[in-house]
């Protein structure tokens, strides 16, 4: 990626998360890592950030690699903060809503759209200088194999909004372009 900015180009090899400040038009690399397919980034109420990498189902504490690394350098291998149950994942969120019970506050929510069709839920806890998360019962699960939750966010009303891609075929052209189930 190369993005031209008023302050000069921002370059990364492979994947990255960027930070944009609208008032100053600053656009900078926030996280540069060899993600397979980054599909989730969320901050908790304390400003800690967590990153979900879709393809492998990896989830990371962002603080460890949220910092300046000059192109083409990358951060080394990072420890995941939860043991993945399924892959791939798509979209993450932290529960922070009066609409949810007290025991769910601060839980990490993680969509899954292939092996498990629903929203997984993990109880966050401190682990040394980092974090760990333990699975608790899923927030929701669909028996419809076409349910593909790909993002989720809390709205100003406190409700959780979930985007459903709803598609019988997913992948990078493993299926014929003329497959009758495509985009149904």
Can you annotate each of these PLM segments?
Residues 1-184:
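Beta-propeller domains with acidic blade repeats across secreted/periplasmic ectodomains
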